[in-house]
Regions:
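N-terminal lobe/hinge region of extracytoplasmic solute-binding protein
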Residues: 43-93, 124
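Aromatic- and charge-enriched surface segment that lines or borders ligand/interaction sites
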Residues: 87-132, 145, 151, 297-299
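Ligand/substrate-recognition segments at binding pockets and active sites
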Residues: 358, 362-429
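Aromatic-rich, solvent-exposed beta-strand/loop patch
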Residues: 109, 155-171, 192-244, 268-284
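Alpha-helical secondary-structure segments
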Residues: 115-122, 149-151, 195-196, 231-236, ...
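Surface-exposed binding/hinge segments that line
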Residues: 101, 134-179, 185-203
Length: 430
């Protein structure tokens, strides 16, 4: 299994497809059934700065950590919610109270049995520290009326509450209370969850190694997205940090890696032509993000609207992906198959209008100041799209200073409001 990626861009960007390469015959039988034992080698395109799933949203960390950690609920292939560590759940008619009955006998990697107090401590920390929890669940209480029940009560109606708790980004990971008691707001000190694999080692800038958890308690039912049976087959998973795209592709084609992440779209034809790998697709959303906490975009909706009116999303997407099989320009924040999809205001997306943009620039009071624009070459499409965005903004008189950083630094600076005005990023729906 080797990963390429295809993407999506939204404002300011588009929608694309993640491309994955799967090595044929190296990690599965000819019938498609899992083969027991061995090590799965995965080439990640960026380094990991944190293994705390509540704090980091980087998909290279998320995809590693979801093998270690599990949440109360998760997502099926169609995007609907299903139980995971919860046996069942109920939502009150006013969408304020979420009651979870817990599965019993679930073991943590340290040998302890999961209890309600672990879930309470975990969800309290997720609400406090995670981007989703702190944004939507502020003021919520987490209680345990009995040994097998946890209740989350929100002060306001949250019709999407279950979806938010099932999100696979900053995971609402259930950890032992003892781990959380020793953790700081910058991260946990121990990586202990309930997932099919347990943490073995992390060599900074080299790799992360996970080992099969012998006492793993899998949910019942047929596998469906992230729900249902989750049977670990390999003895180990080795996630190597391989930031050079050519090396990842070469390693995938040679069989050195079963999975290769985020290969450049320019490598798509070569990978697709190989009988040694299978190219798989997964949708993701590309976005242009404004810093609204500090700086030029704070309280300046007109300037943000001017940038939207300036951008030709089709040209931007083509600059990043070249092959039209790998993207589509759709301003929706969710895919068309999602129950959370909204069509509101999409008429303004990918509708470049130079005259309208210049009028909005004048109304915004923009004085010609240079906008700090963060991007990275760790994801080649991000850099290529950033250059096209800069060209289009220059054409209407908006100045930008593109700062090229490694992806880990971009993620770090994202939470330093004084160091940037605009950045390009992407989010996987899965």
């Amino acid at each position: 299994m080797n990963k390429l990626r295809n993407k999506v861009i939204a404002i300011g960007a588009a929608i694309a497809t993640l491309l994955s390469l799967t090595a044929c015959g190296s990690s599965s039988s000819s019938s498609g059934e899992g083969v027991e034992g061995g090590t799965v080698h995965i080439a990640l395109n960026a380094t990991v700065t944190s293994l705390d799933p509540m704090i980091t949203g980087a998909y290279v960390a998320r995809d590693t950590m979801r093998n270690i950690y599990e949440s109360l609920v998760t997502l099926k292939a169609d995007g609907s919610v299903a139980p995971l560590l919860a046996k069942s759940y109920e939502v009150s008619s006013d969408n304020k109270t979420f009651t979870f009955k817990l599965r019993t006998g679930v073991k943590f990697h340290n040998g302890a049995t999961m209890k309600a107090e672990d879930v309470v401590a975990s969800m309290q920390r997720w609400i406090k520290l995670s981007q989703i929890g702190s944004t939507f669940f502020t003021g919520s209480t987490v209680t345990s009326p009995d040994a097998d029940t946890v209740v989350i009560t929100s002060p306001k109606a949250l019709s999407t509450g279950l979806y938010l708790m099932a999100d696979t980004g900053r995971i609402a990971a259930i950890m032992p209370k003892t781990v959380i008691d020793k953790a700081t707001d910058t991260g946990v000190q121990e990586y202990i969850g309930t997932g099919p694999y347990k943490y073995s080692s992390w060599k900074k800038d080299t790799n992360i190694i996970l080992e099969k958890f012998a006492d793993y308690s899998s949910p019942d039912g047929k596998s469906d997205g992230y729900s249902g049976a989750r049977t670990p087959h390999a003895d180990k998973m080795e996630f190597d940090f391989v930031t050079d795209g050519t090396t990842r592709l070469t390693g995938a084609l040679s069989g050195q890696y079963e999975i290769g992440y985020s290969l450049a779209d320019s490598q798509y034809a070569q990978a697709k032509a190989s009988s040694d790998v299978k190219v798989e697709k997964d949708e993701m959303l590309e976005t242009l993000i404004f810093n609204k906490q500090e700086g030029i975009f704070k309280d300046n909706q007109k300037l943000r609207q001017a940038i939207l009116a300036s951008l030709d999303m089709s040209k931007i997407a083509k600059a990043g992906h070249q092959n039209s099989d790998l993207y589509n320009t759709d301003g929706g924040l969710m895919p068309k198959t999602s129950p959370l999809r909204s069509e509101s205001s999409l008429d303004k997306y990918n509708n470049p209008d130079t005259a309208a943009a210049k009028k909005l620039i004048q109304e915004s009071g923009y004085d010609g100041s240079t906008i700090t624009f963060l991007t990275t070459k760790d994801y080649p499409y991000m850099y290529d799209e950033s250059m096209e965005i800069q060209n289009e903004l220059n054409a209407v008189g908006i100045k930008t200073d593109i700062q090229v950083l490694d992806w880990a630094s971009v993620l770090q600076k994202m939470f330093e409001p004084g160091s940037w005005d605009m950045l390009i990023s992407s989010y996987s729906y899965s």
